[in-house]
Amino acid sequence: DRIYTPKEYWNEGKAYQHSYACNKIYRKGLFEDVRFPKGKVFEDLWTLPLLTGKSKTIATASVGHYNYCWNPKGITATAKGKELNMLLLAHIQLMGFEELAMADNAEYFMGVVNIQMDVHELTGNAPLLVGRRVNDIGKLNGKLKLKAIMLNILGLKYLCKLNKFIHKATRCLS
């Protein structure tokens, strides 16, 4: 029920929370030089920014029905470190699209920090996400606000280590 520019769609419309290709309608011409990447999971997030970047406007509608069936064997349910690392890389690519200004969106950035913490916990790999201070903490709520404060104090590397330690300690106490 709204018309967005690509920047508005990704930030105000929070497209990063629903970046699935299957529940959208596209003009055929958008796919002339855009393809879903082979060998990557979460391929929708790799592709949707390219498609929206070729569009002047994006329309959304509140009418319709999307019947999603949970698949316990699907990628969302079974993703491990390797798959979440691909998701993280797709988000890092998305933040590189300056015209979308995603890197300036504190809520989005902290969501990507969460993915980075999961990747570190599952793989032990050093963070790939470029850490930065979150200046607009006041826009965040609850756990995201606390994590942003901790990110600003500790930095990303040590926030990842603290997160891993807390999860390990919690499992030991259970």
Task: Mark where each language-model region is.
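Donor-binding/catalytic cores of nucleotide-activated saccharide
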Residues: 1-58, 70-80
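Alpha-helix N-cap/helix-start motif at coil-to-helix transitions, marked by capping-box chemistry
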Residues: 20, 25, 62, 85-88
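Extended, low-polarity segments enriched in aliphatic/aromatic residues
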Residues: 56, 63-64
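Catalytic core of nucleotide-sugar-dependent glycosyltransferases
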Residues: 65-72, 78-105, 119, 124-137
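Structural motif
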Residues: 100-109, 144-149
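Amphipathic alpha-helical repeat scaffolds of TPR domains
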Residues: 108-118
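Membrane-interface aromatic/basic loop that binds lipid-linked glycans or pyrophosphate carriers
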Residues: 122-174
